[in-house]
Amino acid sequence: MVAINQKKLNQFLASDRVSFKGVEKENLRSDKDGRISNKSFPEAFGVHNFNSFVTLDYSQPHLEIVTPTFQDNSELYGFLGGLHAYVEQNLEGDLLWNYSMPPKFKGKFIKLPPYGKSNKTKLAHLYRLGLRNRYGDKMQSTAGIHFNISFSESVIKELNTTKTDLYLGICRNFLRMFPLVLRLIGCSPVAHRSFIKDRELSIDLLKEDENYLPKSTSLRVSRLGYYSEEQDEKFITFNTLGEYLNLIKDYINIPNKKFSEISLDLKKQVNNGTIQME
């Protein structure tokens, strides 16, 4: 593994033109009473399968705003702000819920979006159906922001490293610093009671319909939020690309005892591995 010159890396990171950045911002749509919306995808955004900038994630109310990649930070923020404003103006009476943890649930299920009849879209639908059958709607109703970053070939060359070593190193460092990241920027300490109903959790009452965990910063990445006990028991390493790929293949191909109880014949999930796909 090639060591990266830390001084050079700091110099590169001080410039906003050495990397390509993009944002995927998830929001649940809610009605004005603070409940998860049951409306379909707004007509102004067209068919979600073919819209590169405004699409759906897990369910009908789970809206996702996607930017292209930019080198300049101000251009990225400007595009994201403009796209966000456009979305808010075309929600047909709904609002964008501004938190990672969802608003009040109306019923048992959240509507899955239609995906079409091609093999690709059928697989997308089956994958989300599998998530529902494995974990339930509540876990899939949490939202987040994905920050995507890649470095230019000139940077990789100047750092005297390889693309694989650079990105694996970034993953290792992120995991090492993850608790600090949550402590500094985590912002989801409260959950509605309808989200935690019938779950055995030690969590305090904040208001009549809200619960919180004292001194918490992010319920979304806790056992209460987007969490899988089956996946948590597995260990993914980022030491080498080959080791990483072999682990992913095993978690896809080796049947998981709990998920094997879900029917494959009735097309309720992609497979019975610990994870359904890459």
Located regions from the model:
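Terminal catalytic/cofactor-binding subdomain
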Residues: 1-132, 139-145, 165-172, 179
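Loop-rich catalytic cores of soluble enzymes, especially ATP-dependent carboxylate-amine ligases
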Residues: 105, 116-134, 141, 150-278
